[in-house]
Amino acid sequence: MLYFSRWKSALIWLAVLVSLIIASPNFFSRETLENLPDFLPKKQVSLGLDLSGGSRLILQVQNAGKTDLETTANIMRQRLEELGYGNPVVEGEGRNQIRVEVPGLYDAQLLKDILTIRGNLSFRAMDDTMSPDDAIRGTPPADSEIVYSFDDPPVGYLLKKTPILTGHDITDAKASISADDGQPVITLTLDDNGRRRLADLTAQGNENSFAIVVDNQVVSAPTVSGPLDTSELQIEGAFDLQAANNMAVVLRSGALPQAVTVLEERTIASALGEDYASAAVLAALLAALVVGLFMVLSYGILGVIALVALVVNIVILTAVLSLIGASISLASIAGLVLTIGLAVDAHILIYERVREDRRKGYSVVQAMESGFYRALSTIVDANLTTLIAALVLFLLGSGTVHGFALTVAIGIGTTLFTTLTFTRLLIAQWVRTAKPKEVPKRRLKLVPTVTHIPFMRLQFVTLGISVLACAIVVALFVNIGFNYGIDFRGGSMVELQARNGDANLEDINERLAELNIDSARVLPAKSPRSALVIIGSQEVGDDAEQTVAVKLRGEFEQDYSFQRVDVVGPTVSEQLSRAGVLAVILSLIGIFIYVWFRFRWQLALGAVLSTLHDVVILSGMFIVFRMEFNLWSVAAILTIIGYSLNDTVVIYDRVRENLRRYKSAPLPAIIDASINQTLSRTLLTSFVTFLAHVPLYAFGGSEIRMFALALSVGIIVASYSSIFIAAPLLVQFGLKPRETDAGDAVDAELAQSLNLES
């Protein structure tokens, strides 16, 4: 019913108003928000690292249990907060990994230095029974060992293995400038127990009676001529004030319980992030504008209502992201564009049903009511299949792909709400106020209103072509394979920007050769000032990838700024590869189960096979054109899985409906009629979704551009497969009407489309 009681209408408008209030801070500057009353919301959706700039690390905690992982994360968070890096993201991932994101910090090496130092502090007594040189050349005493200093070259000290003091005896550590010589020092504050032990150690009267050791390296070996009965002790060493402050914070926060290894490093400069942000916002706005204009031209006042609902959809989506504290990234923008496509698809389904029922002789009000009612199950099924792919991607994906999956999942919820309640409310108010005598005519036609195309006559041709194409792709995969990006093969990718003039690609190549870095490629970037350096996996462990990153900084930092740094070790690349394959498999399994539950096994199997066809063909595009296959490629494939199922479910839903009504009709005729009845929706939705991705391709970054291109091709392939693969497979699988189905009389239009009457 189009009727809404007052309280239902009030609740819907209240939900929209509350969402607008929650989302409103995102449309104002921070300075404007500061001047608003305190009772108004001021929380904004934060920008992700790819839009704001910053650094991201994936760290592996060795031999970590749950307690060690939590303790390590807390210590890392404390270190970053004390150093002034506000609101860092420090979260556990999996069984033994920690993800760290710090907006505004562009020196990833500094971040690694802060977080990978264990901070094991000890005071160790000197062993004067033999000289360090003799111990190095020979064998040190059983209870002693040689420990080297931070100096260059390092100096060896013969120290007792058992510490006199440890970090547990330290209550505070602060960096300052010495009043004596103006050099940076670290002042340690000891507790009472530590003070007594230090006094006992130095009471022996031996000069150089102890050394201060951090992570098994001597940082200071003070000369002591008498007992030290003090709670404060200064460490002097070869470090500047920043290094001293970093060390003080490390000592103050406590030692990490286990050693930490860097598995993945990603850094993006603020200027590049701002460029990405501007381009992403422009792409999203243009996508919404193009889609909205198309809907208005196609459906008149109903298109205007769809456009208003789309704006409300985006507002509610923004409000939810604000409430849960999510950040907006390039991936989120891509998810937003996909949400726009899903929302428009739902409206097209309803409006095409309305027009179909109006042609059958229904009144405008009856057609509106019937359109919403009959499109409901199709909309829900189509969106839930996409939701399955999004949830799998969220659970198995990593990094920015999480943002895409989260945005799509939330967007599906907001799309269902706005389409099935808010749009319906607006149409009800329009019908009640304007009392229209006719459904608005379509001003823009891509396909005829009614078609009678005999698709099933081509079933063997199309199935044969598709089988042959899939076989060719499989052969190419076996013999050539994907052009894997660093996400799946490991390695480094660095975007350099010349500090003066243009980037000299030849010079960069020569300098890389001098560094003895294997498998390095230098490519031109979007600007003549920039160059892209891609280095393959070193295949000797995660530390080797980090060594390459250090070499690059040391060689090029004076002449080039590092706009972007991505370093992925073999451990992470293997995990991402497994997760990518598993994500596709689980998506197909989940969708098969859902479609089987909602329909029948023939339809479930047909849907999965046609979707698998789309995955294979889309993969073939990556292989043939040697497009880089990375996490974005997996996201594109999973999105197309959802979109393909969306298309297929719409046709299958109509097949199911016609089978129930006309169980005596030949199955090929029913399938032909079902495809023709939904053809305008299929082509309109494909065209609108394709339009939505054009701005994303035009203005997105390189990865987003590849993603948009893959989706655009995937949309075409998915539309083809839903008509020429999924539908004919139902005949091959012997689909029949259920015995309990009751047939209705065949009206003239359906009889003509079913070819049951001449």
From Swiss-Prot:
Which residue pairs form cystines in this protein? none
| Pfam families found in the cross-reference section | Sec_GG (PF07549), SecD_1st (PF21760), SecD_SecF_C (PF02355), SecDF_P1_head (PF22599)
- From the Swiss-Prot or TrEMBL record, state where the protein is found: Cell inner membrane
Q: Which residues cross the membrane?
A: 9-29, 277-297, 301-321, 324-344, 372-394, 404-426, 460-480, 579-599, 605-625, 631-651, 682-702, 706-726
Gene Ontology CC terms: plasma membrane
Instruction: List, in alphabetical order, the Gene Ontology terms for molecular function in this entry.
Output: protein-transporting ATPase activity
NCBIfam families linked to this entry: 2A0604s01, PRK13023.1, secD, transloc_SecF
Please state what the protein is called: Protein translocase subunit SecDF
Q: What is the lineage of its organism?
A: Bacteria, Pseudomonadati, Pseudomonadota, Alphaproteobacteria, Hyphomicrobiales
